[in-house]
From Swiss-Prot:
This is NADH-ubiquinone oxidoreductase chain 5. InterPro entries: NADH_DH_su5_C, NADHpl_OxRdtase_5_subgr, ND/Mrp_TM, NU5C-like, Proton_antipo_N. It comes from the Eukaryota. It catalyses: a ubiquinone + NADH + 5 H(+)(in) = a ubiquinol + NAD(+) + 4 H(+)(out). The chain crosses the membrane at residues 1-21, 35-55, 87-107, 114-134, 140-160, 171-191, 211-233, 241-261, 272-292, 301-320, 325-347, 366-386, 413-433, 457-477, 482-502, 582-602.
Length: 606
């Protein structure tokens, strides 16, 4: 066992310590939250060792196998894959979880079950790391389902609220649709290749692989909230803000994109799958950016921005640039977690008020939080030399300089400019102008449990992109040369978005619409998607069930087939078998004929 394996397993072992100590009774202690936070910090420091060694030894991949079980011809192993993706993702996920857990100690301090909450967060992180380090599909599936069930428990944490329960069920049901795709792919690989080991699958690489790859795309669409399976992501905002921060930054929502990054050796020569992922990502990034434009819940706006960025990652997968997609996963995690923590600080200080129309003037009341929020919004838009710029700019450059679908490229560029629009809208409504909250509201951000995590993520949102982009192995993403006007495309689209936002703000300050426009309704009602998909199918199902119950069961079986048919059969039988039918005239006629014949016979002379 070498250094990579030992330190990776040590990281996972450190994280499982608070879980294993649950039965000792220490989890009821008031210091349990601080203990869990420190454990995650220790795991973060430990995970830095293999990451640094990997970057300085120029190794490609290291795989550790332990035989687990043999089922007929299938050999299952406990297999850990230490490559660029897993070794770089682990420190990022642990750093962000460490910050979120410290923030949770402030945000959830009055919750009676806060220790259980921390345990759930830790399990959420562990299952994500299992997924990231897995080298076979069975192990990956354990992590995949683990993040799914933990998201259900965390989104529905406030189980006394109906909306939270509905959102948790929605998340689990949409993810079950994606799980069908993953299970179908696993079944195909098992029946056709007799293996779930990733390296063997890549070596065999049969053609065509459209069916299993479409299953993987469906799985990624469910887990990473692509268009069609996206409504659960904004609904997940019903959970506590630390859950939203962890869910949307470095864990569950990027699991689908990470799955496709893992399987890129199978996808890189399959044009059909690349086109599907490109178009799906382009539609997602534009649709969710449009939906974010008119939302008034600050967490919903940030949630839709997450979905839009996931669409951009899917576009990058479609461009056959998995390393750029992974870079955007890591950089996006920093500023997205910080945006959620800043929104949580504002919501907590304003007594759980999430409507940006009831905020305003917070720049002076919460100077540190609002500064971090502005930098996070600028990083989200891809402002030069912030973290988002180092991943977003190369993605736009790769899209504009590749032989790709111009339609998908246009949608992506429009969505990029809209990112600047809704980011500016958050700044205008929440931070600037006159205060629109009650004057008696007590506002205080001077708490180290609040300031320190945001401060760490703020540093990450400024410098992490530079560090991560310089750590990409040079043999995977070659340097691109392009004309100056293409090089400036991403910056031009962001600038255009800012200009549009400022112009709209200036033009509509004193403008009142009697009736909302159709485009406003489309954006506010989320493209009518929840209305149609969450109401029409249940309505049709209930209507069909009612028709089946009344027409088929009640009228046909319980009325026509059983009672009426039985009565009719009995009537026919009694009619046929009865001697007396009540026909008086016929009886008299038969008597007459009988008497007449008798008289004729008796009176006939011999």
């Amino acid at each position: 066992m070498n250094l990579f394996t030992s330190f990776t397993l040590l990281t996972l072992l450190i994280l499982t310590t608070p879980i294993m100590m649950s039965h000792t009774g220490s989890h009821v202690n008031n210091k349990y939250q601080s203990y869990v936070k420190n454990i995650v910090f220790c795991a973060f420091i430990t995970s830095l060792v293999p990451a640094m060694v990997y970057l300085h030894t120029n190794q490609e991949t290291l795989i550790s196998n332990w035989h687990w079980i043999t089922i007929q011809t299938l050999k299952l192993t406990l297999s850990f894959k230490m490559d660029y993706f897993s070794l770089m993702f682990m420190p990022v996920a642990l750093f962000i979880t460490w910050s979120i857990m410290e923030f949770s100690m402030w945000y959830m301090h009055s919750d009676p079950y806060i220790n259980q909450f921390f345990k759930y967060l830790l399990l959420f992180l562990i299952t994500m790391l299992i997924l990231v380090t897995a080298n076979n599909l069975f192990q990956l599936f354990i992590g995949w389902e683990g993040v799914g069930i933990m998201s259900f428990l965390l989104i529905g944490w406030w189980f006394g609220r109906t909306d939270a329960n509905t959102a948790a069920l929605q998340a689990i049901l949409y993810n079950r649709i994606g799980d069908i795709g993953l299970l179908a792919s696993m079944a195909w690989f098992l029946s056709n290749m007799n293996t779930w080991d990733l390296e063997q699958i890549f070596m065999l690489n049969q053609n065509p692989l459209n069916f299993p790859l479409m299953g993987l795309v469906l799985a990624a669409a469910g887990k990473s909230a692509q268009f069609g399976l996206h409504p659960w992501l904004p609904s997940a905002m019903e959970g506590p803000t630390p859950v939203s921060a962890l869910l949307h930054s470095s864990t569950m929502v990027v699991a689908g994109i990470f799955l496709l990054v893992r399987f890129y050796p199978l996808m890189e020569n399959n044009k059909l799958i690349q086109t599907v992922t490109l178009c799906l990502g382009a539609i997602t990034t534009l649709f969710t950016a449009i939906c974010a434009l008119t939302q008034n819940d600050i967490k919903k706006i940030i949630a839709f921005s997450t979905s839009s960025q996931l669409g951009l990652m899917m576009v990058t997968i479609g461009l056959n640039q998995p390393y750029l997609a992974f870079l955007h996963i890591c950089t996006h995690a920093f500023f997205k977690a910080m945006l959620f923590l800043c929104s949580g600080s504002i919501i907590h200080n304003l007594n759980n008020e999430q409507d940006i129309r009831k905020m305003g003037g917070l720049f002076k009341a919460l100077p540190f939080t609002t500064t971090a929020l502005i930098i996070g919004c600028l990083a989200l838009t891809g402002m030069p030399f912030l973290t988002g710029f180092y991943s977003k700019d190369p993605i736009i450059e790769a899209a504009t300089s590749s032989y790709t679908n111009a339609w998908a490229l246009l949608l992506t560029l429009i969505a990029t400019s809209l990112t600047a629009v809704y980011s500016t809208r958050i700044i205008f409504f929440a931070l600037l102008g006159q205060p629109r909250f009650p004057p008696s509201t007590t506002i205080n951000e001077n708490n180290p449990l609040l300031i320190n995590p945001i401060k760490r993520l703020l540093v990450g949102s400024i410098f992490a992109g530079f560090i991560l982009s310089n750590s990409i192995p040079p043999m995977t993403t070659p340097l691109m040369t392009m004309p100056l006007h293409l090089k400036l495309t991403a910056l031009a689209m962001t600038t255009l978005g800012f200009i549009i936002a400022f112009e709209i703000n200036l033009d509509t300050q004193n403008l009142k619409h009697k009736h909302p426009s159709n485009s406003f309704k489309f954006s506010t009602l989320l493209g009518y998607f929840p209305t149609i998909m969450h109401r029409l199918p249940p309505h049709l199902d209930l209507l069909m069930s009612q028709k089946l119950a009344t027409s088929l069961l009640d009228l046909t079986w319980l009325e026509t087939i059983l009672p009426k048919t039985t009565a009719l059969i009995q009537l026919k039988a009694s009619t046929l078998t009865s001697n007396q039918q009540g026909l008086i005239k016929l009886y008299f006629l038969s008597f007459l004929i009988t008497i007449t014949l008798s008289m004729i016979l008796f009176n006939y002379p011999e």
